[in-house]
Amino acid sequence: MTLDPQTPVLVGVGQVNQREESSDTEPVDLMAAAAREAADPRVLQAVDSVRVVNLLSWRYRDPGLLLAGLIGAADARTRYSGIGGNTPQSLLNQACVDIQAGRADAVLLAGAETWRTRMRLRARGIRPDWTKQDESVPVPPGGEEKVPMSGPGEDR
């Protein structure tokens, strides 16, 4: 039996935990480090779609665009999720569907938070000097989705 070439396959997993306080390490740097831990540089360069779970600790217009540049996949399409507890799984599901349909060949899913660093810096009156994307950078698909945090039954 031959495997369909468009069968989604998980190639690697990477996780980076930043234990020390560093005002220099921003969320997109953590995502790039995790990506490098997950896959060989040649695999990362082949990524044609970067999908990022919504970040709460720092605002980027398109974090996937920054991440794609850091891993050498500058031409990758990007997607940014809305806020919600199941968004990582939703991004994975959609990546598999897109690979099966031939809309993507290699998808990188990423996410990162630097909340502890932000709060420690804030307590000292310091604002991180992290990447600020110009407002002219378009928000990628998914980035403006409004995900309700409660259903009609809960709103009563």
Language-model features and meaning:
Residues 84:
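A basic- and aromatic-enriched beta-loop-alpha substructure that forms the phosphate/nucleotide-
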